Amino acid sequence: MTDRQTDTAPSPSYHLLPGRRRTVDAAASRGQGPEPAPGGGVEGVGARGVALKLFVQLLGCSRFGGAVVRAGEAEPSGAARSASSGREEPQPEEGEEEEEKEEERGPQWRLGARKPGSWTGEAAVCADSAPAARAPQALARASGRGGRVARRGAEESGPPHSPSRRGSASRAGPGRASETMNFLLSWVHWSLALLLYLHHAKWSQAAPMAEGGGQNHHEVVKFMDVYQRSYCHPIETLVDIFQEYPDEIEYIFKPSCVPLMRCGGCCNDEGLECVPTEESNITMQIMRIKPHQGQHIGEMSFLQHNKCECRPKKDRARQEKKSVRGKGKGQKRKRKKSRYKSWSVPCGPCSERRKHLFVQDPQTCKCSCKNTDSRCKARQLELNERTCRCDKPRR
Protein backbone atom coordinates (compact mmCIF):
# COMPACT_ATOMS: atom_id res chain seq x y z
CA MET A 1 0.00 0.00 0.00
CA THR A 2 2.81 2.36 0.73
CA ASP A 3 4.52 1.68 -2.59
CA ARG A 4 1.33 2.30 -4.51
CA GLN A 5 0.71 5.51 -2.67
CA THR A 6 4.20 6.67 -3.42
CA ASP A 7 3.93 5.81 -7.10
CA THR A 8 0.50 7.35 -7.53
CA ALA A 9 1.04 10.43 -5.42
CA PRO A 10 -0.10 13.39 -7.57
CA SER A 11 1.86 16.56 -7.88
CA PRO A 12 0.71 19.98 -9.10
CA SER A 13 2.86 19.55 -12.19
CA TYR A 14 1.96 15.99 -13.12
CA HIS A 15 0.98 17.14 -16.58
CA LEU A 16 4.42 18.68 -17.10
CA LEU A 17 6.61 15.76 -15.92
CA PRO A 18 6.79 12.46 -17.86
CA GLY A 19 6.26 9.37 -15.75
CA ARG A 20 3.74 10.91 -13.38
CA ARG A 21 0.98 11.03 -15.94
CA ARG A 22 1.07 7.29 -16.60
CA THR A 23 0.51 6.49 -12.93
CA VAL A 24 -2.46 8.83 -12.70
CA ASP A 25 -4.01 7.42 -15.87
CA ALA A 26 -3.56 3.86 -14.62
CA ALA A 27 -5.29 4.69 -11.38
CA ALA A 28 -8.14 6.36 -13.25
CA SER A 29 -8.61 3.28 -15.48
CA ARG A 30 -8.87 1.02 -12.39
CA GLY A 31 -11.54 3.30 -10.98
CA GLN A 32 -9.39 4.34 -8.08
CA GLY A 33 -8.22 7.82 -7.42
CA PRO A 34 -4.60 8.41 -6.61
CA GLU A 35 -4.11 8.71 -2.92
CA PRO A 36 -2.22 11.63 -1.52
CA ALA A 37 1.31 11.21 -0.31
CA PRO A 38 1.98 11.10 3.41
CA GLY A 39 1.89 14.52 4.89
CA GLY A 40 -0.64 15.76 2.25
CA GLY A 41 0.19 17.72 -0.92
CA VAL A 42 3.62 18.26 -2.38
CA GLU A 43 5.90 17.80 0.55
CA GLY A 44 9.19 16.08 1.07
CA VAL A 45 12.41 16.09 -0.83
CA GLY A 46 10.99 14.63 -4.08
CA ALA A 47 8.14 17.15 -4.34
CA ARG A 48 10.49 20.05 -3.64
CA GLY A 49 12.81 18.87 -6.39
CA VAL A 50 9.88 18.69 -8.81
CA ALA A 51 8.76 22.20 -7.85
CA LEU A 52 12.29 23.56 -8.22
CA LYS A 53 12.64 21.99 -11.66
CA LEU A 54 9.30 23.43 -12.75
CA PHE A 55 10.30 26.88 -11.50
CA VAL A 56 13.55 26.73 -13.49
CA GLN A 57 11.64 25.78 -16.64
CA LEU A 58 9.11 28.58 -16.15
CA LEU A 59 11.92 31.07 -15.51
CA GLY A 60 13.54 30.17 -18.84
CA CYS A 61 10.38 30.91 -20.81
CA SER A 62 8.90 33.71 -18.71
CA ARG A 63 10.62 36.36 -20.85
CA PHE A 64 8.68 35.30 -23.89
CA GLY A 65 5.24 34.92 -22.29
CA GLY A 66 4.89 31.11 -22.48
CA ALA A 67 5.15 27.86 -20.49
CA VAL A 68 7.68 25.01 -20.79
CA VAL A 69 6.55 21.54 -21.95
CA ARG A 70 8.67 18.51 -22.65
CA ALA A 71 9.25 17.63 -26.30
CA GLY A 72 6.80 15.02 -27.50
CA GLU A 73 4.17 15.69 -24.85
CA ALA A 74 0.85 17.44 -25.19
CA GLU A 75 -0.03 20.72 -23.58
CA PRO A 76 -2.14 20.43 -20.43
CA SER A 77 -5.85 20.66 -21.01
CA GLY A 78 -8.21 23.04 -19.26
CA ALA A 79 -9.22 20.40 -16.72
CA ALA A 80 -5.60 19.67 -15.86
CA ARG A 81 -4.95 23.37 -15.37
CA SER A 82 -7.95 23.61 -13.09
CA ALA A 83 -6.69 20.60 -11.14
CA SER A 84 -3.26 22.18 -10.67
CA SER A 85 -4.79 25.48 -9.61
CA GLY A 86 -7.33 23.89 -7.28
CA ARG A 87 -10.38 25.09 -9.24
CA GLU A 88 -12.93 23.03 -11.13
CA GLU A 89 -13.72 24.42 -14.57
CA PRO A 90 -16.07 22.73 -17.03
CA GLN A 91 -14.53 21.95 -20.42
CA PRO A 92 -17.05 21.75 -23.28
CA GLU A 93 -16.61 19.62 -26.35
CA GLU A 94 -15.96 22.69 -28.49
CA GLY A 95 -12.84 23.36 -26.46
CA GLU A 96 -11.45 19.94 -27.38
CA GLU A 97 -12.02 20.64 -31.07
CA GLU A 98 -10.23 23.97 -30.77
CA GLU A 99 -7.30 22.25 -29.03
CA GLU A 100 -7.08 19.72 -31.85
CA LYS A 101 -7.01 22.56 -34.41
CA GLU A 102 -4.25 24.27 -32.43
CA GLU A 103 -2.30 21.00 -32.38
CA GLU A 104 -2.56 20.79 -36.18
CA ARG A 105 -1.31 24.36 -36.57
CA GLY A 106 1.65 23.74 -34.29
CA PRO A 107 3.05 25.85 -31.44
CA GLN A 108 3.72 29.54 -31.93
CA TRP A 109 7.38 30.28 -31.32
CA ARG A 110 8.52 33.76 -30.42
CA LEU A 111 11.86 35.14 -31.57
CA GLY A 112 14.51 34.49 -28.95
CA ALA A 113 12.73 31.52 -27.29
CA ARG A 114 14.81 28.59 -26.10
CA LYS A 115 15.16 25.79 -28.61
CA PRO A 116 15.30 22.02 -27.93
CA GLY A 117 18.62 20.87 -26.61
CA SER A 118 19.15 23.90 -24.40
CA TRP A 119 20.82 23.74 -21.01
CA THR A 120 17.69 22.28 -19.34
CA GLY A 121 17.62 19.37 -21.80
CA GLU A 122 13.97 20.01 -22.63
CA ALA A 123 12.02 21.53 -25.50
CA ALA A 124 10.46 24.88 -24.69
CA VAL A 125 7.04 25.39 -26.27
CA CYS A 126 5.96 28.96 -25.63
CA ALA A 127 2.17 29.24 -25.54
CA ASP A 128 -0.07 32.05 -24.36
CA SER A 129 1.29 34.21 -21.59
CA ALA A 130 -1.77 33.76 -19.36
CA PRO A 131 -1.17 30.04 -18.52
CA ALA A 132 2.51 30.78 -17.90
CA ALA A 133 1.59 33.58 -15.53
CA ARG A 134 -0.85 31.30 -13.67
CA ALA A 135 1.63 28.39 -13.37
CA PRO A 136 3.40 29.59 -10.16
CA GLN A 137 0.01 30.35 -8.56
CA ALA A 138 -1.28 26.88 -9.48
CA LEU A 139 1.81 25.33 -7.94
CA ALA A 140 1.24 27.14 -4.66
CA ARG A 141 -2.46 26.28 -4.52
CA ALA A 142 -1.87 22.63 -5.37
CA SER A 143 0.83 22.31 -2.73
CA GLY A 144 -1.51 23.81 -0.11
CA ARG A 145 -4.63 21.79 -0.82
CA GLY A 146 -3.02 18.37 -1.22
CA GLY A 147 -3.61 15.36 -3.37
CA ARG A 148 -7.41 15.31 -3.11
CA VAL A 149 -7.85 18.17 -5.53
CA ALA A 150 -5.23 16.67 -7.82
CA ARG A 151 -7.13 13.33 -7.87
CA ARG A 152 -10.34 15.09 -8.82
CA GLY A 153 -8.61 16.96 -11.61
CA ALA A 154 -7.07 13.71 -12.90
CA GLU A 155 -10.49 12.07 -13.12
CA GLU A 156 -11.90 15.03 -15.08
CA SER A 157 -8.95 15.40 -17.40
CA GLY A 158 -9.80 12.24 -19.35
CA PRO A 159 -7.47 10.30 -21.59
CA PRO A 160 -4.33 12.11 -22.70
CA HIS A 161 -3.90 13.44 -26.20
CA SER A 162 -1.76 11.63 -28.66
CA PRO A 163 1.82 12.90 -28.31
CA SER A 164 2.69 12.35 -31.96
CA ARG A 165 1.09 15.56 -33.22
CA ARG A 166 2.43 17.62 -30.37
CA GLY A 167 5.88 16.19 -30.87
CA SER A 168 5.82 16.98 -34.57
CA ALA A 169 4.47 20.46 -33.85
CA SER A 170 7.18 21.06 -31.28
CA ARG A 171 9.76 19.98 -33.82
CA ALA A 172 8.22 22.28 -36.45
CA GLY A 173 8.36 25.33 -34.17
CA PRO A 174 12.16 25.59 -33.96
CA GLY A 175 12.39 25.16 -37.74
CA ARG A 176 10.16 28.15 -38.36
CA ALA A 177 12.06 30.24 -35.83
CA SER A 178 15.39 29.32 -37.40
CA GLU A 179 14.10 30.22 -40.88
CA THR A 180 12.92 33.59 -39.59
CA MET A 181 16.26 34.28 -37.91
CA ASN A 182 18.15 33.25 -41.06
CA PHE A 183 16.02 35.62 -43.14
CA LEU A 184 16.63 38.51 -40.75
CA LEU A 185 20.38 37.83 -40.66
CA SER A 186 20.60 37.70 -44.45
CA TRP A 187 18.62 40.94 -44.72
CA VAL A 188 20.97 42.68 -42.26
CA HIS A 189 23.98 41.30 -44.15
CA TRP A 190 22.84 42.68 -47.51
CA SER A 191 21.88 46.01 -45.94
CA LEU A 192 25.38 46.42 -44.50
CA ALA A 193 26.93 45.44 -47.82
CA LEU A 194 24.83 48.08 -49.61
CA LEU A 195 25.83 50.76 -47.10
CA LEU A 196 29.51 49.92 -47.52
CA TYR A 197 29.19 50.07 -51.31
CA LEU A 198 27.47 53.47 -51.23
CA HIS A 199 30.04 54.81 -48.76
CA HIS A 200 32.89 53.66 -50.99
CA ALA A 201 31.25 55.20 -54.07
CA LYS A 202 30.84 58.52 -52.25
CA TRP A 203 34.51 58.64 -51.27
CA SER A 204 35.62 57.62 -54.75
CA GLN A 205 33.70 60.57 -56.20
CA ALA A 206 35.06 62.98 -53.60
CA ALA A 207 38.68 61.95 -54.24
CA PRO A 208 38.88 63.26 -57.85
CA MET A 209 37.24 66.51 -56.75
CA ALA A 210 39.86 66.95 -54.04
CA GLU A 211 42.62 66.26 -56.54
CA GLY A 212 41.11 68.75 -58.98
CA GLY A 213 40.90 71.36 -56.22
CA GLY A 214 44.61 70.93 -55.59
CA GLN A 215 45.39 71.50 -59.26
CA ASN A 216 43.48 74.82 -59.36
CA HIS A 217 46.43 76.57 -57.67
CA HIS A 218 48.64 75.78 -60.68
CA GLU A 219 45.95 76.14 -63.33
CA VAL A 220 46.82 78.29 -66.36
CA VAL A 221 44.13 80.78 -67.43
CA LYS A 222 43.42 80.58 -71.12
CA PHE A 223 44.00 83.48 -73.51
CA MET A 224 40.33 84.07 -74.35
CA ASP A 225 39.41 84.29 -70.68
CA VAL A 226 42.17 86.82 -70.05
CA TYR A 227 41.15 88.87 -73.11
CA GLN A 228 37.45 88.98 -72.21
CA ARG A 229 38.09 89.89 -68.61
CA SER A 230 40.52 92.67 -69.40
CA TYR A 231 38.66 94.23 -72.35
CA CYS A 232 36.70 97.48 -71.95
CA HIS A 233 33.46 96.77 -70.04
CA PRO A 234 31.54 98.04 -66.99
CA ILE A 235 33.16 96.75 -63.83
CA GLU A 236 32.33 97.31 -60.18
CA THR A 237 34.57 100.01 -58.77
CA LEU A 238 34.80 101.54 -55.31
CA VAL A 239 34.39 105.30 -55.70
CA ASP A 240 35.12 107.87 -52.99
CA ILE A 241 32.03 109.87 -52.04
CA PHE A 242 34.07 113.08 -51.73
CA GLN A 243 35.06 112.64 -55.35
CA GLU A 244 31.40 112.69 -56.37
CA TYR A 245 30.34 115.36 -53.85
CA PRO A 246 33.37 117.67 -53.38
CA ASP A 247 31.33 120.52 -51.89
CA GLU A 248 30.00 118.58 -48.88
CA ILE A 249 33.23 118.65 -46.95
CA GLU A 250 31.51 119.44 -43.65
CA TYR A 251 30.14 115.89 -43.42
CA ILE A 252 31.76 112.59 -42.70
CA PHE A 253 30.21 109.81 -44.74
CA LYS A 254 29.79 106.23 -43.70
CA PRO A 255 30.76 104.34 -45.68
CA SER A 256 33.29 106.70 -47.22
CA CYS A 257 33.15 104.91 -50.60
CA VAL A 258 30.41 103.20 -52.58
CA PRO A 259 30.47 100.40 -55.17
CA LEU A 260 29.52 101.71 -58.61
CA MET A 261 29.64 100.25 -62.11
CA ARG A 262 32.22 102.23 -64.04
CA CYS A 263 33.96 101.68 -67.36
CA GLY A 264 37.31 100.02 -67.08
CA GLY A 265 39.65 97.83 -69.06
CA CYS A 266 42.00 97.93 -72.02
CA CYS A 267 41.35 98.91 -75.63
CA ASN A 268 44.55 97.32 -76.99
CA ASP A 269 45.41 100.55 -78.79
CA GLU A 270 47.03 103.70 -77.49
CA GLY A 271 44.79 105.88 -79.64
CA LEU A 272 41.61 104.44 -78.08
CA GLU A 273 40.09 104.88 -74.68
CA CYS A 274 37.28 103.13 -72.78
CA VAL A 275 34.36 105.56 -72.47
CA PRO A 276 30.74 105.09 -71.34
CA THR A 277 28.03 105.06 -73.99
CA GLU A 278 25.06 104.60 -71.65
CA GLU A 279 24.67 105.96 -68.13
CA SER A 280 22.11 105.83 -65.32
CA ASN A 281 21.67 107.09 -61.77
CA ILE A 282 21.45 104.93 -58.67
CA THR A 283 20.29 106.08 -55.23
CA MET A 284 21.91 104.79 -52.05
CA GLN A 285 21.40 105.41 -48.36
CA ILE A 286 24.49 106.95 -46.76
CA MET A 287 25.03 108.04 -43.17
CA ARG A 288 26.04 111.68 -42.86
CA ILE A 289 27.86 112.63 -39.69
CA LYS A 290 28.38 116.22 -38.66
CA PRO A 291 31.01 116.46 -35.93
CA HIS A 292 29.67 117.58 -32.52
CA GLN A 293 26.17 118.01 -33.95
CA GLY A 294 24.64 114.69 -34.93
CA GLN A 295 24.17 112.16 -37.64
CA HIS A 296 21.41 110.98 -39.93
CA ILE A 297 20.90 108.61 -42.84
CA GLY A 298 20.12 110.30 -46.13
CA GLU A 299 19.75 109.33 -49.77
CA MET A 300 22.45 110.21 -52.27
CA SER A 301 22.46 109.73 -56.04
CA PHE A 302 25.46 108.43 -57.97
CA LEU A 303 26.26 107.97 -61.65
CA GLN A 304 26.75 104.49 -63.08
CA HIS A 305 27.98 103.30 -66.47
CA ASN A 306 25.81 100.71 -68.19
CA LYS A 307 27.69 100.29 -71.50
CA CYS A 308 31.25 101.01 -72.54
CA GLU A 309 33.12 101.20 -75.83
CA CYS A 310 36.62 101.86 -77.08
CA ARG A 311 36.65 105.15 -78.95
CA PRO A 312 39.39 107.48 -80.25
CA LYS A 313 40.90 109.75 -77.71
CA LYS A 314 40.01 113.42 -77.94
CA ASP A 315 42.66 116.15 -77.62
CA ARG A 316 41.56 118.10 -74.59
CA ALA A 317 43.63 121.16 -75.55
CA ARG A 318 41.99 121.38 -78.96
CA GLN A 319 38.59 120.79 -77.41
CA GLU A 320 39.11 123.69 -75.03
CA LYS A 321 40.21 125.96 -77.89
CA LYS A 322 37.15 125.00 -79.91
CA SER A 323 34.92 125.80 -77.01
CA VAL A 324 36.63 129.17 -76.54
CA ARG A 325 36.58 130.07 -80.21
CA GLY A 326 33.26 130.93 -81.74
CA LYS A 327 31.51 133.04 -84.26
CA GLY A 328 29.83 136.39 -83.68
CA LYS A 329 30.43 139.45 -81.59
CA GLY A 330 29.39 137.74 -78.38
CA GLN A 331 32.15 135.23 -78.62
CA LYS A 332 34.73 137.95 -79.28
CA ARG A 333 33.65 139.84 -76.18
CA LYS A 334 33.95 136.69 -74.08
CA ARG A 335 37.45 136.10 -75.38
CA LYS A 336 38.44 139.65 -74.48
CA LYS A 337 37.04 139.29 -70.96
CA SER A 338 38.90 136.05 -70.47
CA ARG A 339 42.11 137.72 -71.58
CA TYR A 340 41.61 140.51 -69.06
CA LYS A 341 40.93 137.95 -66.35
CA SER A 342 44.03 136.00 -67.22
CA TRP A 343 46.08 139.20 -67.01
CA SER A 344 44.53 140.28 -63.74
CA VAL A 345 44.69 136.79 -62.14
CA PRO A 346 47.91 135.10 -63.19
CA CYS A 347 47.48 132.34 -60.50
CA GLY A 348 47.92 128.72 -61.53
CA PRO A 349 45.79 125.84 -60.27
CA CYS A 350 46.63 124.37 -56.88
CA SER A 351 46.32 120.82 -58.15
CA GLU A 352 45.25 119.43 -61.48
CA ARG A 353 43.81 116.19 -60.11
CA ARG A 354 42.37 117.26 -56.74
CA LYS A 355 41.04 120.73 -57.36
CA HIS A 356 38.01 120.05 -55.19
CA LEU A 357 40.25 119.62 -52.13
CA PHE A 358 41.84 123.09 -52.34
CA VAL A 359 40.65 126.65 -51.93
CA GLN A 360 42.67 129.39 -53.68
CA ASP A 361 42.76 133.05 -52.77
CA PRO A 362 42.41 135.03 -56.08
CA GLN A 363 44.39 137.97 -54.76
CA THR A 364 47.30 136.16 -53.13
CA CYS A 365 47.02 132.91 -55.14
CA LYS A 366 47.46 131.05 -51.87
CA CYS A 367 46.04 127.54 -51.74
CA SER A 368 44.48 126.13 -48.57
CA CYS A 369 42.85 122.82 -47.81
CA LYS A 370 39.12 122.46 -47.49
CA ASN A 371 39.58 119.76 -44.89
CA THR A 372 40.70 120.83 -41.44
CA ASP A 373 42.84 119.05 -38.91
CA SER A 374 39.94 118.70 -36.45
CA ARG A 375 37.77 117.11 -39.11
CA CYS A 376 40.43 114.52 -39.90
CA LYS A 377 41.01 113.78 -36.22
CA ALA A 378 37.28 113.16 -35.80
CA ARG A 379 37.72 110.34 -38.29
CA GLN A 380 40.87 109.18 -36.44
CA LEU A 381 43.03 110.38 -39.34
CA GLU A 382 45.68 113.02 -39.91
CA LEU A 383 45.56 115.93 -42.37
CA ASN A 384 48.11 115.76 -45.15
CA GLU A 385 48.77 119.43 -46.04
CA ARG A 386 50.45 118.56 -49.30
CA THR A 387 47.54 116.56 -50.70
CA CYS A 388 44.81 118.04 -48.45
CA ARG A 389 43.52 114.53 -47.72
CA CYS A 390 42.91 112.76 -44.44
CA ASP A 391 45.43 109.93 -44.31
CA LYS A 392 46.09 107.23 -41.76
CA PRO A 393 48.46 108.29 -38.96
CA ARG A 394 52.06 107.26 -39.41
CA ARG A 395 53.66 105.00 -36.85
Swiss-Prot record:
Compositionally biased intervals (Basic and acidic residues): 314-323
Keyword Metal-binding: no
Disulfide feature: 232-274, 263-308, 267-310
Biased composition (Basic residues): 324-340
Stretches with biased composition (Acidic residues): 91-102
Keyword terms: Angiogenesis, Cytoplasm, Developmental protein, Differentiation, Disulfide bond, Endoplasmic reticulum, Extracellular matrix, Glycoprotein, Golgi apparatus, Growth factor, Heparin-binding, Mitogen, Nucleus, Secreted
A Pfam family: VEGF_C
Induction record: By hypoxia. Regulated by growth factors, cytokines, gonadotropins, nitric oxide, hypoglycemia and oncogenic mutations.
Family: Belongs to the PDGF/VEGF growth factor family.
Protein name: Vascular endothelial growth factor A, long form
Natural source organism: Homo sapiens
